[in-house]
UniProtKB/Swiss-Prot annotation:
Localization (cell): Cytoplasm
Gene: aroA
Protein name: 3-phosphoshikimate 1-carboxyvinyltransferase
Molecular function (Gene Ontology), one example: 3-phosphoshikimate 1-carboxyvinyltransferase activity
Annotated phosphoenolpyruvate binding sites: 25, 98, 126, 171, 346, 387, 412
EC number of this enzyme: 2.5.1.19
Key words, A-Z: Amino-acid biosynthesis, Aromatic amino acid biosynthesis, Cytoplasm, Transferase
PANTHER family associated with the record: AROM/DEHYDROQUINATE SYNTHASE (PTHR21090), PENTAFUNCTIONAL AROM POLYPEPTIDE (PTHR21090:SF5)
Amino acid sequence: MSIESWTAPVASTPVQANVTIPGSKSQTNRALMLAALAAAQGQGTSTIGGALRSRDTELMISALRTLGLHVDEAGSVLTVNGRITPGEDAQVDCGLAGTVLRFVPPLAALSANPVTFDGDEQARARPITPLLDALRGLGVPVDGVGLPFQVQGSGSVAGGTVAIDASASSQFVSGLLLCAASFTQGVTVQHTGSPVPSAPHIAMTVMMLRQAGVQVDDSVGNRWQVRPGTVAARHWVVEPDLTNAVAFLAAAAVSGGTVRITGWPKTSVQPADNILNILFRLNVVVNQTDSFLEVQGSTVYDGFDVDLRDVGELTPSVAALAALATPGSVSQLHGIAHLRGHETDRLAALSTEINRLGGDCQETSDGLIITATPLRPGVWRAYADHRMAMAGAIVGLRVSGVEVDDIGATHKTLPQFPQLWANMLKRSTG
């Protein structure tokens, strides 16, 4: 993937735009996993409509094909069938995709052949050891404690009860739950340690498992029990990626304009309520119907205090908004210590880049304190992180001369980002 330097366009007038956001990465990759499990159980072919096509989802598709499954595209619909039959020397490239890194190893454990996992250099710093230890606890031999590692499948997994510290990533829990119904005894996952971040993503996993006919008991806090059984083949419909939509909604707040996201679901498996709670802190007017969400901004909003533990992936966009608040106002972002293990150390990256442009951003043990100050032109580094690149675009709406050093990082979850962003601003000025 090439590095593309990009001059962030300025919103010289209030943004007025309707934007259609492609499908959710989180939902797409969970649907692919459940479709693969249904096929592997002999339940038949699944289809996925509205699937996101991005680097992360292509890596997931490639991983499933490496395991012997068939993933085909007919128009805008993905079709998944086949069996788990990896060849000798099978190797899964995780890239920088946490969902591939943490969802596919339990699936590979159902293979009768060993499967090796590796990824981008930055991926080698991402937490994975707790998941590998959990697989070992369920009777799966695993060579290695981090990338690269090898899962020594035997064709089946006994399952049982396992304790895991998922305080670094909720994906540890989701990865086990997705495959648990295919394990002989099912799985009971007990989280130990500090609160699990991004809990809505576990809720998404549980909801989608139930939609596939899997019995999940999550009635006890920090414990999830999945009974052994079939995973139904079905047609999945993927929602627009609401997390990616936040950057575009931020444009309304920053410019005093109006942005409408078409296709915003009235009810969602994504953390829509968390997103709305953040938007309301920005002195905006929100209008939601069955078919869209519209935000009207006022250009002026004060700093805010927000716990982002459940939606840590929004932190770069929220930090950019905090940096553009009323000068002198202070924002506190907390509950996000786990972001140090994301695509990059997002707390350090945000502090560095905001301060590079003349801002005032301080790291705390679990977040950031940002005092809004006038920013100056300069290079905003993306660190190969899609969320960091989008944050630079938000800053550039208000600050002329912001150069995002790698807008291509957005290919991870939204390859169309530069064009969608340019079109949004073009419609506003044209």
